[in-house]
């Protein structure tokens, strides 16, 4: 589990990468990132559950 400082680092890294991708490539970047993370996680059901958690309260 990440602590607050680590979460802030992850957030900053993600924000910088989204800026680098640019508005025309943001969706593609996020899909590629999600697929890479799913591969690292190695558990499709857990990925599906996390996806649903991320959709809550958008």
Regions flagged by a language model, labelled:
Residues 27-40:
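An amphipathic alpha-helical micro-motif enriched in hydrophobic residues
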Residues 36, 54-58:
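A short structural micro-motif
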């Amino acid at each position: 589990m990440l602590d607050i400082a680590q979460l802030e680092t992850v957030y900053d890294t993600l924000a910088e990468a989204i800026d680098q991708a640019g508005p025309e490539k943001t969706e593609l970047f996020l899909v590629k990132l999600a697929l890479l993370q799913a591969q690292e996680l190695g558990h499709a059901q857990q990925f599906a559950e996390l996806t649903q958690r991320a959709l809550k309260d958008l």
